[in-house]
Amino acid sequence: MDTIKEEREKLKQFYETSNDYKKLLDAHNREYLQTYVDIVAKYAKPKSRILDLGSGNGLSSSMLSELGHRVTGTDISHFFLADSAKLQSESLNYCISDALDLPFRDETFDVVCSNELIEHVTDAPKALLEMMRVLKNGGILAVMGPNLCSPFWSVIDLISMAKGGKGRHVWAETRRQALAWGFNNFTLSMKKRFSKKADFIHRKPDLDKAIFGGDSDSAYYASPIDIEKFLKANGMKIIRLCEAVSTQGRIMGRLFPRFGLYISVVARKM
């Protein structure tokens, strides 16, 4: 078994057994998920059939179904979705599935969306291909999550430490580490920006620190530049490279669509 397959199995086992990590997901309340839901709802036609990947505790799927859509929420962990049964209805169902091997037929959904999933998969290109496969022609793909390549994360950490706070676990635990992370992210993002092809960078998940949050368990060094280039290369049309709801988010997205803190790519299958 190669290293990436081993890491994939370790991640599955971790997500099936970690009570502490489940508590982090359960803290994702309506307020936390509202921006994601609003962005998906903005592009979904009335009564769309939606696939919500990596839905964790299932709440985001429930919120989308409340808007009149038919929603299937999925997660790799039965443990995470254990409480979702009480949310199910005629327009909402859940299933356990791996984003790298979705149990759905080609062109099944009007919308395929994910929030804070892509950085956790061990093969991001394959996950994106699976999303495109089950998406209908003309359908909407929305991929959201942290831009781990953003140089602005280190700025936030340096400000926090200057005020007496702590840095980010794994990524920027000291000022020196934060400065190095910011510089590396800037040079990496610039390299990606001017590269002809997507360059998906794998990283080894740090599961010992995953219970502290901060995407220590990420397996892909996520960047919107990779996703943009890959989707375009596979016939998708980018509608929004950095979609946002708030005024601050829209300004950030307009000024730094590929370098901001978050990924919020919206594309259409042509």
Regions found by a protein language model. Give the residues of each.
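Short glycine-centered segments of the SAM/dcSAM-binding site in methyltransferase folds
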Residues: 49, 139-140
